[in-house]
Amino acid sequence: MFEKLSCHTSIKIGGRVKYLVLPNDVFSLERAINVLGDVPFQMMGLGTNLLVQDDDLDIAVVKTERLNQIEIKGEKVLVESGTPLKRLCLFLMEAELGGLEFAYGIPGSVGGAIYMNAGAYGGEIGEFVEAVEVLRDGKRTWLSKNEIFFGYRDSTFKREKSIITRVMMSFKREKKEVIKAKMDDYIKRRLEKQPLDLPSAGSVFKRPREDFYVGKAIESLGLKGYRIGGAQISEKHAGFIVNAGNATFDDVMKLIEFVRKKVKEKYGVELETEVEIWWNGRRW
């Protein structure tokens, strides 16, 4: 039975896969990966920073959305990889553990956030990681923070064949009302500046350097609202490409390349995509 990935990505684009695997816990995830054996597969969290080809993919997809348990251990928190970031932020607020407020409103799972070292407003999730449990060569093992590289929208996990299963994170005590005030401020800013009313895959491009703001650069080129097919540069924030109506993978890819070309011509800067791209069953 085929499953449409367009039903599982926030931008509402994606072809069909023959197998969609939804493990209920870490143990069933481990079993599923071992059962798949030589069958090619890709891991998916909540599909929020992902662009998938329209054609059918001859792979299995393992989605971690049911791995969403959180366990508190003093000022440390053990989180399963499929846990939505929003849920973790609300849990931390109730537990009066501060630091991750900047992530409130970032869509996606904890595993996906660790994979790309998600961040916003000067904070990055990698700052709070104590250890990560991964599934490697069919077995689960823990990596300490000293064994993990985190960079700007980058991590060890983009370079090696391992699957994030659980994360141990460390936070500091903070009053609930202080945490809530920060979270309210961040979500207000997101609502004001980001196109949360339309399907998208989030911020499309990485910032090439600290003083170069991609959205402002694209806006300066007069490209807000520019459209190819159903894919459109957001009129609210030029760093986002939205699905304005029946957009295809090809529409979005053409728009990405068009923007990269124009920015290169004007500013001499090569933009790299932040959004993950699946094409021919591979990550790009």
Swiss-Prot record:
Positions of the FAD-binding PCMH-type domain: 12-174
Keywords associated with the record: Cell cycle, Cell division, Cell shape, Cell wall biogenesis/degradation, Cytoplasm, FAD, Flavoprotein, NADP, Oxidoreductase, Peptidoglycan synthesis
Enzyme Commission number(s) of this protein: 1.3.1.98
Record's keyword annotation contains Cell cycle: yes
Top-rank taxon, per record: Bacteria
Catalysed transformations (reactions): UDP-N-acetyl-alpha-D-muramate + NADP(+) = UDP-N-acetyl-3-O-(1-carboxyvinyl)-alpha-D-glucosamine + NADPH + H(+)
Class in the EC hierarchy, top level: oxidoreductase
Location in or out of the cell: Cytoplasm
Cellular component aspect of the GO annotation: cytosol
Primary location: cytoplasm
Gene Ontology BP, a term: regulation of cell shape
Described function: Cell wall formation.
UniProt record similarity statement: Belongs to the MurB family.
NCBIfam families: murB (TIGR00179), PRK13905.1 (NF010480)
Protein name (record): UDP-N-acetylenolpyruvoylglucosamine reductase
The organism of origin for this protein: Thermotoga petrophila (strain ATCC BAA-488 / DSM 13995 / JCM 10881 / RKU-1)
